[in-house]
C-alpha cells in the first residue's frame, strides 16, 4: 500500500537506463566505486597511523622507564 514494490523499482530502473544510457551509468558506477574505495583506504591508513603513533609512544615510555632503572641498579652494585 504505502511501500514501493519490486515492480515499481524495476520500472524506475528501466526509465533511468533509457534516459542516461548504460555507458554513462557504468562510468558513474565506476566513479562511485572508486570514491568509496578511496574513502575506505583513507580510513584504514588513518587508523594504522594512529596505531603506529600509539605503539611508538608506548615503546618510548618503556625505554625511558628502563633507562631510569639501570642507573639505580648500577649504584646498588657499586655500593
Curated annotation (Swiss-Prot):
GO terms for molecular function: protein transmembrane transporter activity. GO terms for cellular component: TAT protein transport complex. Residues 42-79 are annotated as: Disordered. It is a single-pass membrane protein. It comes from the Bacteria. InterPro entries: TatA/B/E (IPR003369), TatA/E (IPR006312). Keywords: Cell inner membrane, Cell membrane, Membrane, Protein transport, Translocation, Transmembrane, Transmembrane helix, Transport. One of its GO terms (biological process) is protein transport by the Tat complex. It is found in: Cell inner membrane. Residues 67-79 have a biased composition (Basic and acidic residues). The chain crosses the membrane at residues 1-21. Residues 57-66 have a biased composition (Polar residues). Pfam families: TatA_B_E (PF02416). The Tat system comprises two distinct complexes: a TatABC complex, containing multiple copies of TatA, TatB and TatC subunits, and a separate TatA complex, containing only TatA subunits. Substrates initially bind to the TatABC complex, which probably triggers association of the separate TatA complex to form the active translocon. Belongs to the TatA/E family. Part of the twin-arginine translocation (Tat) system that transports large folded proteins containing a characteristic twin-arginine motif in their signal peptide across membranes. TatA could form the protein-conducting channel of the Tat system. This is Sec-independent protein translocase protein TatA. It comes from Shewanella denitrificans (strain OS217 / ATCC BAA-1090 / DSM 15013).
Amino acid at each position: 500500500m504505502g511501500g514501493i514494490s519490486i515492480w515499481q523499482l524495476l520500472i524506475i530502473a528501466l526509465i533511468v537506463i533509457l534516459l542516461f544510457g548504460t555507458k554513462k551509468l557504468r562510468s558513474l558506477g565506476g566513479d562511485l566505486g572508486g570514491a568509496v574505495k578511496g574513502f575506505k583506504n583513507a580510513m584504514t591508513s588513518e587508523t594504522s597511523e594512529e596505531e603506529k603513533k600509539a605503539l611508538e609512544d608506548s615503546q618510548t615510555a618503556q625505554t625511558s622507564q628502563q633507562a631510569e632503572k639501570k642507573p639505580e641498579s648500577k649504584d646498588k652494585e657499586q655500593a
